[in-house]
Amino acid sequence: MSKYTILDKINTPSDLKLIPESQLKILSAELRAFLVDTLDVSGGHFASSLGATELTVALHYVYNAPDDNIVWDVGHQTYIHKILTGRKDKLVTIKKDGGISGFPKRSESEYDTFGVGHSSTSISAALGMAIADRLQGKSSNTVAVIGDGAITGGMAFEALNHAGGIKEDILVILNDNEMSISDNVGGLSAHFSKIISGGFYNSIREKGKEVLKNIPPIFEFVKKVETQTKGMFVPANFFEDLGFYYVGPIDGHDVTELVKTLRILKDHKGPKLLHVITKKGKGYTKAESDPIKFHHVAPSFHSGENITTKISKPTYSNIFGDWICQKAAKDKRLVGITPAMKEGSDLIRFSQLYPHRYFDVAIAEQHAVTFAGGLACQGLKPVVAIYSTFLQRAYDQVIHDIALQNLDVLYAVDRAGLVGADGATHDGSFDLAFMRCIPNHVIMTPSDENEAYHMLEFGYEYNGPAMVRYPRGAGIGAEITGSLDLELGKAKIVKQGSKIAILNFGTLLPLAKQLAEKYHATVIDMRFVKPLDEIMLDKVSQTYEIILTLEENCIAGGAGSAVNEYFVAKDLSNKIIVRNFGLQDKFLNHGTKDLLLAQSKLCVENISQELDKLI
């Protein structure tokens, strides 16, 4: 007999609506158990979905998706949503090749109204949907679900301001679990904490509800008193000042109260915000105690089966974490900045050693970059630790605020290239292309851990903006040496051959060496995308018949394109054969990194097929 007596009856939201409301609490417990059992096999984002279980059940119980629009922010919390919308049996395939995505994806399900992976986009998208439906005469409801971490992003404020200003009929649900991936920071987060701890304020609201129940004729009077009460005990309610009808905070794990509240709000027209308090990791004791550790889990996290202990190589993030701590000890001008990715960027130790020189600016990439510029103007040396995919969000600031003024800012760009299971929303496919065209920048692509360490040092000491890009995960185990012969814009010949030259940019150097063994080719570690080693390119063009470029970045506009541009400018394009190998002009699905590299033709077999045609 199945232990999922209620869940077994549910494949779609229509099935969910047939379940008596009195059984929703039991269903929520079954959903958590199912999530634990499934992710123990597959792995995946865990704690966020546990925290949003009752909220997800209530939303699909009250609203009529997909006719009603439910828009999720970031997507870490949507595994329960996937279970309730026809993907229960596929959850075990999540983030696997050919399986379902770890994030909402429009091409995957009609219930995934908006594709997501980055933060703070939900309110903007939901507002667009609400207006579009209204203009087309549809009577649908639109809900945006956003966390207390994501709502600190500036884009969320812009959307709130717009929605409140035009009085659009939209519900924003603030899922306040006091815990995004890294601890929330900033004034708004502190404001939420004050609300949560304000027992007197909550008791006032509960008494107000009783008054409303028992004396309906004085509804408007009580509403006015409640507004005044909030003004007395809570600093001016931010959301009501923006034009939203604010409700809450309420218990986000009381599914009965959630259903009741959502039904009321469904009939209340105009912009409204429901503030729910949840606990990330709810129902799984270890995740409740350490939600950061259980934000994402590996297979066998629960059963403990097949878990082996092995000593792994340091990741590139670890190399950065070591470098910044060591450099900070020597240079008091160094300050470290991250947009809410302390753990992922390996800044934990730095934040502990140098708390007054560590700045987590929350999900605010634009602010992070310009803030760094301000620090640089006053003589400090800021290091911005940021993922490649999130650097995209601060492009204007990189150009206008840093490059134009030639300020000393070092970008430590993590997760450059393919990231694997998280898919296209998190791949760092474009940074070389969009950074290379900006004047005043130095761009470095280390081929191993030792180069990464010394390029960080070089970029820090460089007078002007510099960028070092490095991939997710471990390197090849290269030892960090005391020094490295590193000169601005100079490449290094790794292996000497004939006829074929392979110009490698970054950590695909092992692939270049494999090809060199097969074709007796010369391998050159280019090291710098900007400036290019033009002397080396001149020698290569005079010596070799075939030139290959390798990079884990989009081909269009990337490092290989820079090489092409140089050869065209020198009128050499008709005298040599050049082939660029990098990421193709398409978005890749999730999968293992080796699989995605092969799909991008970045493997010995695919490159050999191309080379064999040319030889």
Swiss-Prot record:
Cofactor(s) needed for function: Mg(2+); thiamine diphosphate
PROSITE patterns: TRANSKETOLASE_1, TRANSKETOLASE_2
Residues the record lists as binding Mg(2+): D148, N177
Gene Ontology molecular function: any one: 1-deoxy-D-xylulose-5-phosphate synthase activity
A Gene Ontology term for the protein's cellular component: cytosol
Enzyme Commission designation: 2.2.1.7
Keywords from the UniProt entry: Isoprene biosynthesis, Magnesium, Metal-binding, Thiamine biosynthesis, Thiamine pyrophosphate, Transferase
InterPro entries (alphabetical): Dxylulose-5-P_synthase (IPR005477), THDP-binding (IPR029061), Transketo_C/PFOR_II (IPR009014), Transketolase-like_Pyr-bd (IPR005475), Transketolase_BS (IPR020826), Transketolase_C (IPR033248), Transketolase_CS (IPR049557)
Residue stretches in coiled coil: none
Record's function text: Catalyzes the acyloin condensation reaction between C atoms 2 and 3 of pyruvate and glyceraldehyde 3-phosphate to yield 1-deoxy-D-xylulose-5-phosphate (DXP).
Family membership noted in the UniProt record: Belongs to the transketolase family. DXPS subfamily.
Subunit structure: Homodimer.
Name recorded for this polypeptide: 1-deoxy-D-xylulose-5-phosphate synthase
